[in-house]
Amino acid sequence: MIFATLPDHFLPGFGDNPKNARMTDRFYLNQLRIPTPDNPLRILVSACLTGIACGYDGTPYGQYPSVLKLLNYANVRLIRFCPEDYAFGTPREMCDIHGGTGFDVLDGQARVLTESGEDWTGGMVQASLKMLELAQREAVELAVMMDISAACGSQVIYAGNRFAQQKVYQIGAGVCAAQLMRHGFKVISQRDYASLEILYTKIDPEHVVNGEAIDQHETAWYQNYFGAGEKGSGEQ
């Protein structure tokens, strides 16, 4: 399955600024097919979310049970990939986007810099192309990715160095998530709990829906932080 590149204004949930991802596509999630073991749902996932030790410090980010649970289903095929490990190895420096979002990096208008100032823009773009190639080859139907990441973020990322004395967040996607979105793939984050609830209704007929689950953009932190604009200061 090969997806044509979509203009940003055709991508759902991007608000007034097409380069800023604001919400998940719940309509799409509700239309997902019911998978079977013979024809499993193909989900691309940030490898760190499944317990693989590919975090920047060589540890896994396996603290999200709502994502780890996907490993238990025979009717789900997980395609696990860490773009930063692919491009820069593990362990590695932490990196963030400076001067825009992942879309801006793809357009040559922003850079990816490590905490020590090394420019990793080229490597990150190459990693995004590798992730896109994998998604197309495997015909993935959804991507579940690590938010905040300069590579995999889909709702919120840092605006500049996350280790700055006054850290700043912004609404937007990381480089690899932006690459996938531009080519028609749907992306949700590990913090989009309402969207994950919809996903589980498709793969588990016995799943009891948590009606109080909300997505990242619906949290009090998000609403308070971004209420006056797309950037701000504070802790999450």
Question: What residue ranges belong to the model's regions?
Answer:
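Active-site and ligand/interface coordination hotspots across diverse enzymes
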Residues: 3-61
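Divalent-metal-activated hydrolytic enzyme cores
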Residues: 21, 38, 106-130, 166-236
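Short amphipathic alpha-helices and their capping/turn segments at secondary-structure boundaries
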Residues: 24-38, 65-77, 89-91, 127-142
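Short, well-ordered beta-to-alpha junction loops that form the rim of enzyme active sites
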Residues: 48, 146-150, 192
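Short catalytic/ligand-binding loop motif for oxyanion handling, primarily in non-cytosolic enzymes
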Residues: 53, 89-90, 151-155, 196
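Glycine- and acidic-residue-enriched helix-capping/strand-helix junction motifs
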Residues: 55-63, 161-171
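Short, surface-exposed acidic-centric catalytic microdomains
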Residues: 63-113
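Internal, conserved structured core segments that host functional sites
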Residues: 139-163
